[in-house]
Amino acid sequence: MDFSIKGCDWSKGEAKGFLTGKSDCIVLGIFEAQTLSGAALDIDTATKGLISRVVKAGDMDGKRGKTLFLHEVSGIGASRVLLVGLGKQDAFNQKAYTDAVTAAWRALLSTKIVQVTFTLAQLPVDERSSDWGVRAAILALRNETYRFTQMKSKPEPASHTLKRVVFSVDPADEKAAKLAVKQAVALANGMDLTRDLGNLPGNVCTPTYLGNTAKKIAKDWGLKAEVLGLKQIQALNMGSFLSVARASVEPPQFIVLHYQGAAAKAAPVVLVGKGITFDTGGISLKPGEAMDEMKYDMCGAGSVLGTMRAVAEMGLKINVVAIVPTCENMPGGNATKPGDIVTSMKGLTIEVLNTDAEGRLILCDALTYAERFKPAAVIDVATLTGACVIALGAHNSGLFSKDDALAGELLDASREANDPAWRMPLDDEYQDQLKSNFADIANIGGRPAGAVTAACFLSRFTDSYPWAHLDIAGTAWKGGAAKGATGRPVPLLAQFLIDRAGQ
């Protein structure tokens, strides 16, 4: 799909090109109380009051998400006009904008329209410029057009015909909007990779498959990939990681992917993604209901790989290292048992009280491995705890960090990217729940504050660098009729790296 930018100040009568240019449809916003947006006012004048008459007749009340097509409109080059309800003008925020553009895309994609002129990006949203509106609109469109059909015997063809979108933006934002297009397309491509990896079944998306995916990203985008096998992992003394992998016939992989966009001596940001390609719970076996969704337990890994692809396509001036420990968590005669004690790469001994608390066991060795890069910051991403889903639901990812500056950067990025996160506590008092009578630390701390104690466990392995943990158990995929991976938190991570790179 082709996206282009055209500057226009509707208030200064600069709309001639939009009024006369050929297009299958021009998209206009209407607020409640019969208030026309700036572009709608100009089109209303050109059509001799048609938009006003439609609104006054009650055919378009401006309620958020409502849409109405007008056909064969005289006075403009477009063959159709799509009116989109924006809701109340004084409540027009990020969510209202996202709802409006999503409704617009759904209406457009249900037609045979090929080329669209899109004016909604110029709407005032929380004092943001129109380049932000362009990026959010492209991501909403790509979200609507995403389909996972590669496992079907007859993949479904695209049902829409949309090929080209022309965005009108404020003239002062034209340069930034062109960059926003590039970033949005790269980000959407990264999210699609993340979704594809998550949606693949566990018999296809194995640890080896993830390793090969990392190698392909490296080959396609000029990165460096290292994929360590069982013997190399053993040589690194990653006893905690290996304790999870031991009962599976699928060999574990330890993936390291390097992107160098800055000087070689510049400290990298390290992203660590949990890569459990299927989680049965091990000997602490999960209930059978909805266990199929445990193929999504590698979404932390998928989001890290998707972010690396997006960063490479954007060409960010920053160094980034991705680390993905990946394996299956299976029961079997060789499986780790509740009560077993294992030794981590750091040398800390861990009493495994529950084998279904395995994500932290593979992440802790990866966090220790990250020390060798002398990182500027380390962010781990994991579908770690059901407790986080209970606490935050499916809207906010859980953010844990003792570093206020790093946490602040991530929260700012989450707001800018419209990929929400909520900071959770990480007080030292919670560490007491992880005490073990027989080892240095237990891998669970009981039912109270389960998401917090999981993060506390990880924090024991992060003394050497600024660190944050994102628990995406509630946000990485949707269940039920809409079952599928979401691609989150790729937007948050990418925005954090964009901000760090100063781009």
From Swiss-Prot:
Keyword Ribosomal protein: no
Sequence positions that bind Mn(2+) 2: K274, D279, D297, E358
Single GO molecular function: metalloaminopeptidase activity
InterPro entries the record matches: Leucine_aapep/pepB, Macro_dom-like, Peptidase_M17_C, Peptidase_M17_leu_NH2_pept, Peptidase_M17_N
Positions that bind Mn(2+) 1: D279, D356, E358
Keyword Zinc-finger: no
GO cellular component assignments: cytoplasm
One Pfam family here: Peptidase_M17_N
UniProt-listed GO biological process terms: proteolysis
Domain of life from the UniProt record: Bacteria
EC number: 3.4.11.1, 3.4.11.10
Record's keyword terms, sorted: Aminopeptidase, Cytoplasm, Hydrolase, Manganese, Metal-binding, Protease
Catalysed reaction equations from the record: Release of an N-terminal amino acid, Xaa-|-Yaa-, in which Xaa is preferably Leu, but may be other amino acids including Pro although not Arg or Lys, and Yaa may be Pro. Amino acid amides and methyl esters are also readily hydrolyzed, but rates on arylamides are exceedingly low; Release of an N-terminal amino acid, preferentially leucine, but not glutamic or aspartic acids
Task performed by this protein: Presumably involved in the processing and regular turnover of intracellular proteins. Catalyzes the removal of unsubstituted N-terminal amino acids from various peptides.
Official protein name in the record: Probable cytosol aminopeptidase
Organism of provenance: Burkholderia ambifaria (strain MC40-6)
Gene: pepA
